[in-house]
């Protein structure tokens, strides 16, 4: 097995889905080895980029696969790739031990559909990644994510804070 320091980062996208009231979609994770407690189980949709796939196309695909949502318009993008390391204690089990963390390209989208479009139980025919969901004020997000992802969420919130307005 490769040393933790030598492992690459998984290329990934993240989506901040903002409704017409300026609130952000968060999903309650369906468990996982990084689970630390019942407060830090919420996150925004995110997922891997397939080889040769455009990041925006990957983001739309991941959003659909995790939430069933297609009714969106792109309203923002973090210009940089954001990186986080997973704790060494779970690195050997997460992603079959192939990565030390993720490098993420983040997008903000305005949700133009109705809440009834959201389905985390059988999203787009894929295995559910969330067991529930809710709309949350953007500034609360960093306190709801697993601690090792908090710096990324703080940066995403800072980048998109002006978008948390009712339209």
UniProtKB/Swiss-Prot annotation:
Keywords: Hydrolase
Nudix box (motif): residue ranges: 47-68
GO MF annotation, one: bis(5'-adenosyl)-pentaphosphatase activity
PANTHER family: NUDIX HYDROLASE 26, CHLOROPLASTIC (PTHR11839:SF22), UDP/ADP-SUGAR PYROPHOSPHATASE (PTHR11839)
Described function: Accelerates the degradation of transcripts by removing pyrophosphate from the 5'-end of triphosphorylated RNA, leading to a more labile monophosphorylated state that can stimulate subsequent ribonuclease cleavage.
GO terms, biological process: nucleoside phosphate metabolic process; ribose phosphate metabolic process
Protein family: Belongs to the Nudix hydrolase family. RppH subfamily.
Cofactor: a divalent metal cation
Residue ranges of domain Nudix hydrolase in the record: 8-158
Protein name as it appears in the record: RNA pyrophosphohydrolase
SUPFAM superfamilies: Nudix
EC annotation from Swiss-Prot or TrEMBL: 3.6.1.-
Gene designation per UniProt: rppH
Pfam families assigned: NUDIX
